[in-house]
Amino acid sequence: GVSDAAAYGVNGTAELADAIRTVKGQNIYLVAVVSTCVDTLMAERYAATAQQTASGSAYTDSSGGWVDPYNTFTRTYLVSLCKELRELGFDEVAFSYLQQPLAAAELKYAGQTGSPSRTDAVVALAKYLRTSLSATGLRVSAIVSADSILQEKAKLSGQDMTVLPKLFDRVCVFAT
């Protein structure tokens, strides 16, 4: 597992270190996919990290439990996790779920005055991650959904395709 995830009780059961050493020994480029805004265990175990609806309840949907992109704990955890993945031997991280839910529910954000847009929330997190990881030598990419970047859904997902390609080494479009 990854020690930071284990420390918070949100890690999986796989022990990666030996497998990574074996693969790296074969000179294979490794990419870790890191879910940014959907983390059911984090949202359940650390309620303060959960994305909230306008009524104050934790937001969940078929993707799982969502975490607040402005939450300091969430941001620090993501950066720490990525740095640890780099130390394990990963060459790149690709952020999945770097978006907001596609449902029309109104969302509240931690420590934010006013009502930032979903795009503001996603771009703020993307900039934070990019800046925080820039000195690591780790390539940083984003995975976006073809559905969520369509004009009518882009405002809901917050995935601004005029900004994300400027922040990341590559943007991968996941076609559904």
Spell out what each predicted region is:
Residues 1-13, 109:
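Aromatic-lined carbohydrate-binding/catalytic grooves of carbohydrate-active enzymes
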Residues 10-14, 68-76, 116-123:
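Soluble non-cytosolic domains of exported or imported proteins
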Residues 16-21, 82-83, 123-130, 161, ...:
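Generic structural signal for well-ordered alpha-helices
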Residues 29-39, 94-95, 116-158:
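Aromatic-lined carbohydrate-recognition surfaces of secreted/lumenal glycan-active proteins
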Residues 37-83:
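Active-site-adjacent "subsite" loops/lids of carbohydrate-active enzymes
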Residues 40, 46, 91-119:
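Active-site-proximal loop/short-helix segments
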